[in-house]
């Protein structure tokens, strides 16, 4: 048989699907079908997982923009690139993945890395320097050392200093990469922590 004996049909990309609903149908002689089965399943399973999760997070955010930052936790470079693409299909407004941004013409956005914080003598100095560089878009990564004891308090200190200096706080916030996110978010939902 030849490759021309293989027939494939799939639903349009971005279509909402439900459990047990076929996404792709491949009709081919058994050997040809088995040759492509693993590749097709790997691509579809990973990307539909990411797009679905992104869609749920975007829906839960109720209009607040959600960004994709998954490259460092992806199962390899290709999964990072195509995971970013899937997150965009799921409704994310941007990615930190520069290659994905270039390949798929999607907005590249980001904050700073843990290495930025670690390159300064202390966390507060790193935050203050970043805030001075980006006063109109200041999002501080607060879990490099200790989220509750230093990260969030140092971020609040920097934001209060900005406000006291007359710098309008338009696009500012904190970013968490680790820990019990639900618990931390309950403690800190505004520029001043709750008691």
For every predicted segment, state its role.
Residues 2-10, 188-195:
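Conserved small/polar residues in nucleotide/adenosyl-binding loops
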Residues 1-4, 100-102:
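Non-catalytic terminal segments and appended small domains
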Residues 14-190:
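Buried, small/hydrophobic-residue-enriched core segments of structured protein domains
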